[in-house]
């Protein structure tokens, strides 16, 4: 794998990954991001087994396709210290080493075999939903009071998002042991 990418694009993607990855995991692969250079895009994936984050960077120059995983936090710390807006060259040196290079700086990072990275296959690319972020945030803020904080009842600590096609009967629901909140969606 060998590609060049803009520093800002890579930093933005890796900063989103920091909210998903596990820092103190018993599985080292969960602290890593999957980097996949294929076609005309770089696909960056992070997961903690409960949620998955996938970001595609289109403005990338790929010399050699491939994929690898490396520690997300270490890579993010390196990338954010590179000069903003400059090109970063990324290359797999071997199965367990990769190199980041920008201007006069070179860093070698340890990698883990990408086959070990846990990907949730079923229904992953099923459907895309677009919502106005401000309206969605308002709905989440209205709904969060009724989410249970009881760790013994983890099945009550989430929000159910229901979207139907065509009839505009979309809603969010949150429930705790004594509260129920249902709201129409901002579609």
Question: Where are the regions a protein language model picked out?
Answer:
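Structural preference for solvent-exposed beta-strand-turn elements
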Residues: 1-183
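Positively charged, low-complexity/disordered segments
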Residues: 185-187
């Amino acid at each position: 794998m060998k590609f060049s990418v803009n520093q800002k694009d890579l930093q933005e993607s890796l900063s989103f990954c920091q909210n998903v990855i596990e820092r103190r995991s018993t599985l080292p692969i969960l602290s890593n991001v999957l980097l996949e250079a294929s076609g005309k895009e770089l696909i960056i994936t992070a997961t903690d087994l409960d949620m998955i984050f996938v970001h595609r960077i289109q403005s990338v120059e790929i010399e050699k396709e491939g994929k690898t995983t490396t520690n997300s936090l270490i890579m993010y710390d390196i990338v954010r210290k590179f000069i903003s807006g400059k090109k970063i060259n990324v290359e797999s040196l071997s199965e367990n080493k990769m190199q980041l290079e920008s201007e006069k700086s070179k860093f070698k990072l340890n990698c883990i075999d990408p086959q070990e990275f846990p990907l949730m296959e079923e229904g992953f690319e099923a459907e895309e939903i677009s919502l106005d972020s401000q309206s969605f945030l308002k709905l989440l803020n209205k709904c969060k009071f009724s989410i249970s904080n009881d760790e013994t009842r983890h099945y009550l600590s989430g929000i159910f998002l229901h979207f139907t096609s065509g009839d505009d009967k979309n809603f969010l629901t949150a429930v705790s042991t004594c509260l129920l909140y249902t709201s129409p969606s901002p579609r």
